[in-house]
Swiss-Prot record:
GO terms for molecular function: N-acetyl-gamma-glutamyl-phosphate reductase activity; NAD binding; NADP+ binding. This is N-acetyl-gamma-glutamyl-phosphate reductase. Pathway: Amino-acid biosynthesis; L-arginine biosynthesis; N(2)-acetyl-L-ornithine from L-glutamate: step 3/4. The keyword ATP-binding does not apply. It catalyses: N-acetyl-L-glutamate 5-semialdehyde + phosphate + NADP(+) = N-acetyl-L-glutamyl 5-phosphate + NADPH + H(+). Belongs to the NAGSA dehydrogenase family. Type 1 subfamily. It is found in: Cytoplasm. Catalyzes the NADPH-dependent reduction of N-acetyl-5-glutamyl phosphate to yield N-acetyl-L-glutamate 5-semialdehyde.
Amino acid sequence: MIKVGIIGSTGYTGLELIRLLHNHPNAKIIALCSRINASKSVIKEFPSLISYIDLDFVTPNEKKLFECDIIFFATPHGVAMNSVSKFLNKDIKIIDLGADFRIKDSTEWSKWYGMTHTQGDLLKDAVYGLPEVYNSQIKNATLIANPGCYPTAIILALKPLLETNIIDTKSIIADCKSGVSGAGRSANIATLFCEVNESLKPYNVDQHRHKPETQQVLTDIAGKEVNFFFTPHLVPMTRGMLASIYVDLIKDINVQKLFEKHYQNNKFIHILPTNVYPQTKSVKGTNNCHIGIQKSNNKLIIMSVIDNIIKGASGQAIQNMNLMFGLDEGLGLEQIGLLP
């Protein structure tokens, strides 16, 4: 049984880790950390966990953490980088759901996140945890940088095209929409009900922090520099993400067949039939990514949807854990979507 600890267990991604890991046949949560709620009963703070979790929250310095086989950091950027070394030195595996190890260049990271990276030497060892791209590296990793939600949706939609070199890599447009849970659980005026209800707005246009990690991986896949324009939007729903990506084809091939063949053996990526378009409701509560394709002359639109908290965060983290421990990557993650 894999002994699991979660640091930052009261945010949306931390709570989703608890929910998913409870049903994992090979994992057992032994430590849930929260500075604010230390010593408080988990079920008193989160009644949805009554009869499922019989633990009290502990501080991140709790000795129990050193009994873990793996620790998930479901924390804001800047937290994991100052804490992981003491666990790695004890041969405890780490998955960081934050952004601390996603960008390989510490100077570039500091530019986007506004602070100095204190563990630049670990960046070279961290593996970007997108199993559909770095599967073999994840299996041998001890430190995983779990991808952001936007990068996950964008990269999965573009991977087959970049690997076959059939699109212009300088004119890609990513038009993305996210549910409000992507902003986290902390109080914020911008995500209050009255601010987001019946409203749709772009934000951080081409300046979102997820852009550099996306560009880094797309360039790695293509083997040459990839540039893209990125407009994220906030939509008035709790969870879900849609990425509509516009590209110019430089070769005329059957793109539908290309995608179907590319992902035919993949557990979580599903290519929809021609003229069937993805919707966020179809993947809600799952680790799936649905992809639809529409071609018009030399233009191609790829549409991908994910649950931003599961495939975009906690589910993907568990998928990575499975690979790190030599398990089937889908273990504990094959839920059917919620409908309605």
